[in-house]
Regions:
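Bacterial N-terminal signal peptides that target proteins for export
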Residues: 1-9
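Bacterial N-terminal signal peptides
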Residues: 8-19
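Zinc-dependent metalloendopeptidases
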Residues: 19-252
Length: 252
């Protein structure tokens, strides 16, 4: 039994060392998303959608968000759903508590997007963010190498929201060859999902309640701001790498 315990301790130590050397020296294994899988791209870049449960104003914002992604120059086509089994479904639920979507194409089932009432009044920011998930993109601040770029203050995260900050291994990303992007539409703001979010000052990584603090940079006022509802240049590059390039969309 003693020999077994020794061997187990050695293996555990090696596993921790491997995690530190390959996934970021400061990444705490307790903050790693487990049982994750690499998202799948939508076949042919065709995404059927259903927005019939939304109000007229919400439908307009959802369509604008789709147009933002198509303007990236990626080979993407959003089409109204007819009888497809796999499609993006805007649920129309504004009381779900959080904005949610599954990541990527789901074989044999739909992707549900929930957006709270507050965010339907903030232009197309959140619809574009949740569509990013539906296209297969994780949160930027959950990258395997994020510790080189941001500090995550887990002590300030709202109960039940840690999963939105846990880091995801590189093997579980649909594309992992782009640089870290503070301006990504998939990056949270400084205070989001914070336990004292109402007291936190977005754009100030030194705020006592801040969850995200850029490492050695002045990007506090950049991360998660999504200026003019833009999808960043790096977001666009990711979309083109996954779905191919639509030269006609780029030239417009």
């Amino acid at each position: 039994m003693t020999g077994f315990i020794v061997r187990w301790a050695i293996l555990l130590g090696l596993a921790r060392l491997l995690a530190q050397t390959t996934l970021g020296a400061d990444s705490d294994p307790a903050h790693m998303q487990v049982n994750g899988t690499k998202p799948m791209a939508w076949p042919g870049g065709v995404i059927p959608y259903d927005i019939t449960k939304l109000s007229a104003d919400e439908q307009t914002l959802a369509l604008r968000a789709m147009a933002r992604w198509m303007a990236t120059g990626a080979q993407l086509q959003f089409i109204p759903r007819s009888n497809q089994v796999e499609y993006v479904n805007f649920t129309g639920r504004t009381d779900a508590g959080n904005n949610t979507s599954q990541d990527g194409f789901q074989k044999g089932k739909r992707v549900d997007i929930n957006i709270t009432a507050f965010w339907w009044h903030q232009a197309e920011w959140m619809p574009a963010h949740e569509l990013g998930h539906a296209l297969g993109f994780h949160h930027e601040h959950q990258r395997w190498d994020r510790d080189e770029f941001v500090t995550i203050h887990y002590e300030n995260i709202k109960p039940g929201r840690q999963h939105d900050y846990d880091w995801i291994p590189q093997t579980n990303w649909i594309v992992s060859s782009t640089a870290y992007d503070y301006r990504s539409i998939m990056h949270y703001r400084v205070c989001w999902a914070g336990a004292c979010e109402s007291e936190c000052k977005d754009g100030d990584g030194n705020s006592p309640c801040a969850v995200i603090d850029p490492v050695g940079t002045n990007f506090d006022r950049v991360i998660g701001q999504w200026d003019d509802n833009h999808i960043s240049a790096t977001d666009a590059e990711k979309a083109r790498r996954v779905y191919g390039t639509n030269a006609a969309a780029i030239s417009r």
